[in-house]
Amino acid sequence: MATLFDPIVLGDLELPNRIVMAPLTRCRADEGSVPNALMAEYYAQRADAGLILSEATAVTPMGVGYPDTPGIWSDDQVRGWSNVTKAVHAAGGRIFLQLWHVGRISDPLYLNGELPVAPSAIAAEGHVSLVRPKRPYVTPRALDTEEIADIVEAYRQGAERAKAAGFDGVEIHGANGYLLDQFLQDSTNKRTDRYGGSIENRARLLLEVTDAAISVWGAQRVGVHLAPRADSHDMGDSNRLETFSHVTRELGKRGIAFICAREAQADDSIGVALKKAFGGPYIANEKFTLDSANAILAKGDADAVAFGVPFIANPDLVERLRQGAELNPPRPETFYTGGTEGYLDYPTLA
C-alpha cells in the first residue's frame, strides 16, 4: 500500500516521494515574460517535492492571458529559466515546464491589441483576470485550419527550449478551459473541419501537441494536465466520461510519463475510470490534505498527489506532511501581486 513518502517512477524519472508541486501562476516574471532570480529562489525552496510542475508558461505571445507570467518563446526566457532549473537541481529537485496557451481566456490588453484565438468564436462568461476596472471576455477569433499547425509548432519549439533551459521534462497544459481544453470540449468547439465534431477530431490538437513534445523529449519525459471536472472558465462537455476516456486511452497508447488530473474527490468523479483507461501513472490534484492524499493512494485510485496552495504557503511542505506538522495559512491577497511578500517569506519549520 503506497504512501506519499514512497518513491515512484514516472516515465524514466525516479522520484523520492509522491508529493508533486502543482502548477501555480504567481505573476512574478520580469518584462518580456522573463523568469528572474525571485523565481529561482521560490522554486529552489520547494525542491523537496518529488516533482515540481512549473507555473503555466506561454509558448507564444498570443498565448498570454495574465500579467507578468513567464514565456518560453525567446532566448532571454530560456536564460531566465536556466537559472531556475540550476537552482532546483542544486537543491536536489526535479522540475518539468508546463507548456501553455490560454486561447480565448485573454484580452487584447495582453495581446498587443489582437483578439484572442480559440477553436470557435464563443466568448467565455466572466471577467478578464487581474484587470481593473473589470471587463468581460471578448469574443475570440476562430483559428483557421491552416493556422493550427503553427500552434503545434509553437508547442514543439517550447519543448525544445525547455530542454535547452535544463528542465527534466515538460507537461502539456490541456486543462482549466485554456486552448487545448477549448478544442477538446464540445461547448467551446463548434468547428466543422478535422479539429471539430467527433471526439476524435476534438482531441486531435491535444494529441498533436503531445506528439510534438514527444518528438523532442521522448514519451517518458512528457506529462499531460487535464481537468475532467470541466468547470473552469465557462467550460462544459456533453459527455465528460466519453470525451476524457478517449483522451486518456490515446495518451496511454503513447506511453507518456503521467497524467495529472484536477478531478479526484467529488461524488461524480470519473478519475478512477480515467486512471484505468490511461494505464500509466495518474496524479490526482484537487484540494488534498495529508489524510485524503494517503487515502486515495491507499485505494489505488491515484499514484501520486499534487498540492497547490499548500506549497505556496509552505516551502517545506514535504517535511511538514512527514511530521504531521501544522501548515502555514496562505495569504491569497499576495498570490498575484509581485515581489517577495507572500512569495519568499513564508516560514519553514525551525
Identify the residue ranges that each predicted region occupies.
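Flavin-dependent oxidoreductase catalytic cores
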Residues: 1-350
